[in-house]
Amino acid sequence: MASGTVGGLSEVYSSAKRILLRARNGIEKLERFDSDPTDLASSVKRDITEVQSLCSNMDGLWRSIPVKSQRDLWRRKSEQVGEEAEYLNQSLEKYMWRNQRKMLEAKERADLLGRGSGEGAHILQIFDEEAQGMNSVKNSKRMLEDSFQSGVAILSKYAEQRDRLKSAQRKALDVLNTVGLSNSVLRLIERRNRVDTWIKYAGMIATLVILYLFIRWTR
């Protein structure tokens, strides 16, 4: 009795997995629009319904298996089939909802175009301009974020160079003090240090000005 039940379960399970694969391939074709969406969607829906029916049969069969280890194994397989069928069913429903929305939008657009060059065409032009404006805002935002990141990287580079320069200057001054060079040489080094500092700040200010002008330009 147990072997017969397991054998029947194996056949039902194999059939369910085969139909699941066919339904999954059908949904992938729907996403690519390789076939007629209406007929293919109906075929996929029938496959999912058939798998759900087979899953109910499996649920009744595995409960009659006396050996607990085998019963638990087939329970998990039955649950797996049910979960896959539910996932495909949700995917199909999402596709059908998106497809219906696209068809509705296309119909509304056609209705607006059908009104000629009057109010409908004007409304359609407004929609197109708003869509272009949103795309322009997204592009400007992305460019601004890229420019900001570049500015931050430049400022970080300046800060890193400043720290390295200060460390090198301290070491140089220590060496100069050790060998006893003249005060004129030390003043020359300090003057060069001030010039480098001004160059650094000028670069930072120029970067901020460029960012400000870019923000004003994108608005």
UniProtKB/Swiss-Prot annotation:
A single GO BP: regulation of protein secretion
Main location: Golgi
Membrane association type: Single-pass type IV membrane protein
N-acetylalanine modifications at: A2
Xref: Pfam families: V-SNARE_C
Transmembrane portions of the chain: 198-215
Swiss-Prot/TrEMBL keywords: Acetylation, Golgi apparatus, Membrane, Protein transport, Transmembrane, Transmembrane helix, Transport
CDD domains: SNARE_GS27 (cd15863)
SUPFAM superfamilies per the UniProt record, alphabetical: SNARE fusion complex
Cellular compartments annotated: Golgi apparatus membrane
Upper taxonomic lineage: Eukaryota, Viridiplantae, Streptophyta, Embryophyta, Tracheophyta
GO molecular function: SNAP receptor activity
Residues on Cytoplasmic side: 2-197
Protein name: Membrin-12
GO CC list: cis-Golgi network; Golgi membrane
Family the UniProt entry places it in: Belongs to the GOSR2 family.
Stored PANTHER family: GOLGI SNAP RECEPTOR COMPLEX MEMBER 2, VESICLE TRANSPORT V-SNARE PROTEIN VTI1-RELATED
Function: Involved in transport of proteins from the cis/medial-Golgi to the trans-Golgi network.
Vesicular side: 216-219
